[in-house]
Structures are given as structure tokens and as C-alpha cells.
Amino acid sequence: MEEINKKDTFIEPILKENKDRFVLFPIKYPDIWRMYKKALASHWVAEEIDLGNDNVDWEYKLTDNERHFISHVLAFFAASDGIVNENLATRFMSEVQIPEARCFYGFQIAIENIHSETYSLLIETYIKDKQTKDKLFNAIETIPCIKKKAEWALRWINDSDSFAERLVAFAAVEGIFFSGSFCSIFWLKKRGLMQGLTFSNELISRDEGLHCDFACLLYTKLQRKLDPKVIEKMIRDAVECEKEFICESLPVDLIGMNSRSMSQYIEFCADRLVVSLGYKKIFNSSNPFEWMEMISLQRKSNFFEGKVAEYAKTGVAIQGNNQQKNNQSRTLVLDEDF
């Protein structure tokens, strides 16, 4: 593993100015192209979320603590997608010179906008008091625990650190900073509450998982990787920030979950990310929530049952009978693990 020297003038091949960046074909990175097609096939819109029964659960089935917890989680999510998009639009889209990756980033921006719209719609639906609603919509300024997470992510946008470091940082945002909140909402699904919220959580967590996978894939294209010590420090910082948010400032105890188990789950997610980046585990923590594995399997099954017809309709999943072998890399295969 060749390590990064910040004083070096070396430029990664995927960041070098590329005169062919405006033309897509021929595909030079088929694995990145497949990832883009995979993202394209999972497209959805906020109007698909049925919130019809959520208000009843919100008013009559949730406790004050549960409402407080959910509203603050939604406030963080509503701001975080905008932060991710800020980075994509102002840094990554212009830095990365390969068109296949730009296709993915362009679509990711659209999906993050849908996420942001969905979270804003959820807050708009559940929160009736205007003052409370305004506070949640401005959470990165008004709520300290959310402000701290936002500042961690924002500093990487304007930072002069290497592309590799910033790529890993935003993989940590999507792979670690979202993990505790996603898990807590799945806990509500396990209890049969808030069907609209939990369905949107399924869709969004799937999307963010794919975005994180893409960051890891792009990292493999870098010739000079980060020193393991740099990776460990970044990941530990992100883990501590997420633990403080979901186990202390906004404790999952409020919704009946165990903070110690949640802390372990965050470490498990961090280890999964580190391994995907090509490094050794840091925490060696197992998944304390077996039901999260079951939800993942159910999500994959239900997703395909409901969406395959739509793929065929748009031609995304269709492989022509006469397609040549060298074009097969551009076909979405529906046995991929979402």
C-alpha cells in the first residue's frame, strides 16, 4: 500500500484532467458503471411514502420521549443530506475526472435531494407547532448534538486534506453517522409503529448503503492509499461522535433500546466500512441486533418483488439477445445484493 505524502505533487489517475470526460462510451470502468446502473434501478420519489396512518401512531402510540427522539433524528437527517450534496457538487463532481463516476455522483445528488425532501416532509407532517418545526429545520444551528455532527462533516468539504481522506470521511458520514439513527427507526418497525417513517427508512438506508459501497469502490481505484493509522484515527473520531449523539445526547434509551448494544452496533458498522476499504477491523465488534440482519434480508426480498416490473418497463434490467460480450458489463444483473 503506497501511502500519501501531502508534499508530493503526485495526482491520482482518476483525478487527472481527462479530455474524454465529456463522452461516456466506451466504458473504461465497468464496475463503476454497474454501480451507477444499480443506483439508477433503485430510484424512488417522496410521493411513494404513505403517511396516512403515521399521525395516529405519533399522537396516540408514541411517548413524549419517543417523539422527542424521532424528531431530533429527522432533524439531523434533513440537514445531513444537504451537507453530502454540498460536498458532491462543490468538490467530488469537479475533482473526479472519470465519466462513469460522475454519472453516479450526478444521480446520487438527485437521490439525496429526495431524501432531504422526504425528511422535511416527515417533520412537516408530524410537528404541528411552528416554533418547534423551525428549530428542527435549523437543527445544525439550534441543536448542539446535531451541530457537532454537522461540523465534523462540513470541515471536510473546505479542508485541504487529500482526496483520499475526504473520500473516506464522507464514507464515514454515510456508513457510520447514519448507522445508529437507521437502526433506531428499524426498532420502531420491529414494534409495528410508524409505517410511513419506517418504509422511508428502508429505502433511504438502502440508498446510503449503496453510496457508501461506491465510495469504497472508488477508493480501490486510488494508487496511493491512506496509512492505516490515519484511517483508524478518522474512523474512531466518527464512531465517538456517533456514540455521543445516539447514546448520550439523544440516548436510544428514550425509545427502549439499550445504549450499550447500540454503541456496539456502531462499532460493528465501522468495522464493516474499514474492511470494505481494505483495512483490518478496529473494534472486532459483532452485531448485537440479530433482527437487523433479518430486516436486511426482508428488505432485499420485498424490494425485488415490488420493483422488477418497473425495471423492465424502463429497460434497465433488460439484456438484449444479440448483445455482444464486451457490452455485457453495462447490463444490470438482478441478483446483486442491495
From Swiss-Prot:
Catalytic activity: a 2'-deoxyribonucleoside 5'-diphosphate + [thioredoxin]-disulfide + H2O = a ribonucleoside 5'-diphosphate + [thioredoxin]-dithiol
EC number of the protein: 1.17.4.1
Keywords: Cytoplasm, Deoxyribonucleotide synthesis, Iron, Metal-binding, Oxidoreductase
Entry keyword annotation includes Oxidoreductase: yes
Subcellular location: Cytoplasm
Gene (UniProt): rnrB-1
Residues that, per the record, bind Fe cation 1: D81, E112, H115
Name the record gives this protein: Ribonucleoside-diphosphate reductase small subunit
Lineage summary: Eukaryota, Amoebozoa, Evosea, Eumycetozoa, Dictyostelia
Listed GO CC annotations: ribonucleoside-diphosphate reductase complex
GO BP: deoxyribonucleotide biosynthetic process; sorocarp morphogenesis
Self-association state and partner proteins as the record states: Heterodimer of a large and a small subunit.
Cofactor(s) required, per the database record: Fe cation
Keyword presence, RNA-binding: no
Purpose: Provides the precursors necessary for DNA synthesis. Catalyzes the biosynthesis of deoxyribonucleotides from the corresponding ribonucleotides.
Taxonomic source organism: Dictyostelium discoideum
Bound cofactor: record note: Binds 2 iron ions per subunit.
PANTHER family: RIBONUCLEOSIDE-DIPHOSPHATE REDUCTASE SMALL CHAIN (PTHR23409), RIBONUCLEOSIDE-DIPHOSPHATE REDUCTASE SUBUNIT M2 (PTHR23409:SF18)
